[in-house]
Amino acid sequence: MVYKIKKYGEDVLKQIAKEVELSEINDEFRQFLDDMVETMYETDGVGLAAPQIGVSKRIFVCDDGNGVLRKVINPIIVPLTEETQEFEEGCLSVPGIYKKVERPKRVLLKYLNEYGKEVEEIAENFLAVVVQHENDHLDGILFIEKISPMAKRLIAKKLANIKKETKRIKEENE
């Protein structure tokens, strides 16, 4: 099942997502994760957080660019270096906008997998960018909040148009 992506202006994208309880992790939950993966690939994304499909839970899925898929539940991210990297980011929830964001180059990612088992791994370079971007969604933060003031001014009109379209669609569906 492919979910509809929530766009900039939707309230769910500004909320702090709730933790997943261990008791919630079952076959139905794993099917939900598979549907998230399908949605991510169908929309040409490299990551997708649950709030982006209207589910305020601490879950994201991502592909490291080499075909290695992760299904991440209740993530904790710890920077492992002060060295940063700047990477041009985009977001399925903020279509058509790509801007450079500076983030730690290497992080420790702790999470539960789709079976409720604890996983710890080091994410570097591109994967570090992806997991930090997706984790921000779980805290109600979009990448456009992390760009320079000048870059924000340059995209203000595009953002206003996305928000206006989101509001129009929401009103049509009510």
UniProtKB/Swiss-Prot annotation:
Q: Which UniProt keywords apply?
A: Hydrolase, Iron, Metal-binding, Protein biosynthesis
Instruction: One Pfam family, please name it.
Output: Pep_deformylase
Source organism, top-level taxon: Bacteria
Q: Which SUPFAM superfamilies match?
A: Peptide deformylase
List GO molecular-function terms, semicolon-separated: metal ion binding; peptide deformylase activity
Q: What is its EC number?
A: 3.5.1.88
State the reactions this protein catalyses.
Answer: N-terminal N-formyl-L-methionyl-[peptide] + H2O = N-terminal L-methionyl-[peptide] + formate
Q: What does this protein do?
A: Removes the formyl group from the N-terminal Met of newly synthesized proteins. Requires at least a dipeptide for an efficient rate of reaction. N-terminal L-methionine is a prerequisite for activity but the enzyme has broad specificity at other positions.
List the protein's name: Peptide deformylase
Q: Which organism is it from?
A: Fusobacterium nucleatum subsp. nucleatum (strain ATCC 25586 / DSM 15643 / BCRC 10681 / CIP 101130 / JCM 8532 / KCTC 2640 / LMG 13131 / VPI 4355)
Q: What is the lineage of its organism?
A: Bacteria, Fusobacteriati, Fusobacteriota, Fusobacteriia, Fusobacteriales
